[in-house]
Amino acid sequence: MRTLWIVAVWLMGVEGNLFQFGKMIKHKTGKSALLSYSGNPCYCGWGGQGPPQDATDHCCFVHDCCYGEENACYPKTAFTLKFENQIIICDEDPCNYAVCMCDRVAAICGGENVATSDAKYLFYRSMGCEEESVQC
């Protein structure tokens, strides 16, 4: 029960429309975003600091940077997306499009690096995450 509570609190702090981002990740990786990528190790999940620890963590780092660049748009916005022939198509509204594209790029990156994702990083915070953060 404690684990469920921790996950619920974690979900409240995640930027972006988590459900839609999760659909993209599932579409591109075949894996559940929550079960396979939470806390991998420095940037996947809420917050982030230190240098990315692996290719998957780097995808999440780039995602965080993208949200930072789109600061004029509310990153928790719901947007329209669809899947056509394995391609993620984003809504055309400027802010929705910007946020959706941040999620889309991260999901594609995750799909390209699915083989490098290591289960040992699930809900794991590495000592390397305490090092100085890299710039976007």
Swiss-Prot record:
The UniProt record lists the keyword Zinc: no
Intracellular or extracellular location(s): Secreted
Tissue: Expressed by the venom gland.
Pfam families: Phospholip_A2_1
Reactions accelerated catalytically: a 1,2-diacyl-sn-glycero-3-phosphocholine + H2O = a 1-acyl-sn-glycero-3-phosphocholine + a fatty acid + H(+)
Cofactor note: Binds 1 Ca(2+) ion.
Keywords for the protein's UniProt record, in alphabetical order: Angiogenesis, Blood coagulation cascade inhibiting toxin, Calcium, Disulfide bond, Glycoprotein, Hemostasis impairing toxin, Hydrolase, Lipid degradation, Lipid metabolism, Metal-binding, Platelet aggregation inhibiting toxin, Secreted, Signal, Toxin
Gene Ontology BP terms: angiogenesis; arachidonate secretion; lipid catabolic process; negative regulation of T cell proliferation; phospholipid metabolic process
Domain of life: Eukaryota
GO cellular component annotations of the record: extracellular region
Annotated GO MF terms: calcium ion binding; calcium-dependent phospholipase A2 activity; phospholipid binding; toxin activity
Residues the record marks as active site: H63, D103
Residue numbers binding Ca(2+): Y43, G45, G47, D64
Entry cofactors: Ca(2+)
Residues making up the signal peptide according to the UniProt record: 1-16
Gene3D superfamilies registered for this protein in UniProt: Phospholipase A2 domain
Cystine pairs: C42-C129, C44-C60, C59-C109, C65-C136, C66-C102, C73-C95, C90-C100
Changes after translation: Glycosylated (2.5%).
Family statement drawn from the similarity comment of this UniProt entry: Belongs to the phospholipase A2 family. Group II subfamily. D49 sub-subfamily.
Miscellaneous: Negative results: does not show cytotoxic activity on human fibrosarcoma and melanoma cell lines.
Protein role: Snake venom phospholipase A2 that inhibits blood coagulation and platelet aggregation induced by ADP and arachidonic acid. Inhibits tumor cell adhesion and migration in a dose-dependent manner. Abolishes the attachment of human brain microvascular endothelial cells (HBMEC) to fibrinogen (IC(50)=0.2 uM) and dramatically reduces its adhesion to fibronectin (IC(50)=0.3 uM), whereas no effect is observed on type I collagen, vitronectin or laminin 1. Also blocks the cell migration toward fibronectin and fibrinogen.
Protein name: Acidic phospholipase A2 CC-PLA2-2
UniProt organism field: Cerastes cerastes
